[in-house]
Amino acid sequence: MTAFLNDFSKFYGTGEKNEAGQNLEEFLELYDPRKYETPSNTTDAVIFAYEGESCDSIDGLKVLLVKRSNHPSIGYWALPGGFANMREDLDETARRELEEETGVKGLVMEQIATYGDYDRDPRTRVITTAYMAVVPENAVKVQAGDDAADAVWCEVNL
């Protein structure tokens, strides 16, 4: 098997051979990535918006939601998000999916949590990393796209 990365020099460790007598190149040549079941990785973006000059209170706070246009959960409201590409960092996935589904781009988002219940998606095992941003409502314009039927700001009632 060819190594997943072209440059794996930072993974040499001390340069020792393992118990099977393999150096890193030999180990990677024989490694089978199908040996273990692997989950899919997704990201979701929790984007809050506030009215006015600053976010001094949670009164009037809104969250950005998209209406799913495909299965699973077709017609349900969800956070914007989706699957990571194989050679894409999760930060990039969060930005790409947010833009594809809502037209929103250029936000600075913070990684806030990871969700991994094994039965959270009927398609396959999915681990989701959530990102968050808080923005003035008038700073972003939302437009549904990709697999989102609609994209709207919804009031948060706590």
Q: Where are the predicted features?
A:
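N-terminal leader/linker segments that precede catalytic domains of diphosphate-processing enzymes
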Residues: 1-158
